[in-house]
Curated annotation (Swiss-Prot):
Family, per entry: Belongs to the tetrahydrofolate dehydrogenase/cyclohydrolase family.
Gene designation: folD
Catalysed reaction equations from the record: (6R)-5,10-methylene-5,6,7,8-tetrahydrofolate + NADP(+) = (6R)-5,10-methenyltetrahydrofolate + NADPH; (6R)-5,10-methenyltetrahydrofolate + H2O = (6R)-10-formyltetrahydrofolate + H(+)
Protein name, as recorded: Bifunctional protein FolD
EC number(s) on file: 1.5.1.5, 3.5.4.9
UniProt keyword list: Amino-acid biosynthesis, Histidine biosynthesis, Hydrolase, Methionine biosynthesis, Multifunctional enzyme, NADP, One-carbon metabolism, Oxidoreductase, Purine biosynthesis
Annotated S-S bridges: none
NCBIfam families found in the cross-reference section: PRK10792.1, PRK14184.1, PRK14186.1
Role played: Catalyzes the oxidation of 5,10-methylenetetrahydrofolate to 5,10-methenyltetrahydrofolate and then the hydrolysis of 5,10-methenyltetrahydrofolate to 10-formyltetrahydrofolate.
Species name: Oleidesulfovibrio alaskensis (strain ATCC BAA-1058 / DSM 17464 / G20) (Desulfovibrio alaskensis)
Amino-acid positions noted as binding NADP(+) in the UniProt annotation, renumbered to this chain: G164, R165, S166, S193, I234
Length: 286
């Protein structure tokens, strides 16, 4: 069984980006710049933002975190986004979700310049993904694809099952898996709460991707022997953090599996850095 180590892979990605940034920084005239907007004091969001700041520093990216009161108005938040859109030294804008009640997250995401939408959630970038055109890809599914590629695990010609249909993970991941390319070209089935005989669908998967937000939902009897299992879920339980997959028993059946934590979480942040550096290169012409 291969443990798909997202933490180590993400560290390698950061190191590669740092070398790239160091080599091009003089020509560009500045380092890449990422702006992170955090509204309110949600503890989990604060941890995520700190992790992103540390990762940026490792990769040679200058980050600015804008920590805004939960009492901010929609207009104030929109004005902040507009100001960051206008700044030449900012290559990427990330709006940390979820937003406090009363704020329209979709409207805010749509106000971010698509050329700075390094989270990949703007309708323009989602549309480009659907059409197979170049653009920023959502970070979590793109991180999943990078992890598969780094371990030379190609789903091409295989049956891939995606549990979950969210706009953040399930939908874009299904599109990426079914696209043309050496680490795509899968036959994809998307499952959700209304899927009949969900367990049987899972048992037929050569590649099983789980992103439903239910701790230890996928058990060993739902997994085809030798399948590759990617657990995107992270859930807080009384015993600590747990994924959507019952890791211990499933790891005895799968040929490769991601741990939680240390699997897809670090890869999500790594992809954010990849997108930011790509934006910087394009905007600076290097």
């Amino acid at each position: 069984m291969i443990l798909l180590d997202g933490k180590a892979t993400a560290a390698a990605v950061r190191e590669e980006l740092k070398k790239d940034v160091d080599a091009l920084k003089d020509r560009a005239g500045r380092a890449p710049g990422l702006a992170v907007i955090l509204v309110g004091d949600d503890p989990a969001s604060q941890v995520y933002v700190r992790n992103k700041e540390r990762a940026c520093a490792d990769a040679g990216i200058r980050s600015e975190a804008f920590r805004i009161s939960a009492q901010t108005t929609q207009q104030e938040l929109e004005e902040r986004i507009a100001a960051l859109n206008a700044r030449e030294d900012i290559d990427g804008i990330l709006l940390q979700l979820p937003l406090p009640a009363g704020l329209d997250s979709q409207r805010c995401l749509e106000l971010i310049d698509p050329a700075k939408d390094v989270d990949g959630f703007h309708p323009v970038n989602m549309g480009k993904l659907t059409l197979g055109l170049p653009g920023f890809r959502p970070c979590t599914p793109a991180g999943v694809m990078t992890l598969l590629e780094r371990y030379n695990l190609s789903p091409a010609g295989k049956k891939a099952v995606v549990l979950g249909r969210s706009n953040i993970v399930g939908k874009p991941l299904a599109l990426m898996l079914g696209a043309s390319g050496p680490f795509a070209n899968a036959t994809v089935t998307v499952c959700h709460s209304r899927t009949p005989d969900l367990a049987q669908q899972c048992r037929e998967a050569d590649f099983l991707f789980v992103a439903i937000g239910r701790a230890n939902f996928v058990t060993a009897d739902m997994v085809k022997p030798g399948a590759v299992v990617v657990d995107v879920g992270i859930n807080r339980t009384e015993n600590g953090l747990a994924g959507d997959v019952d890791f211990g028993p499933v790891s005895k059946v799968a040929s490769a599996i991601t741990p939680v934590p240390g699997g897809i979480g670090p890869m999500t942040i790594a992809q954010l850095l990849v997108n930011t550096v790509a934006s910087w290169k394009k905007r600076c012409g290097v």
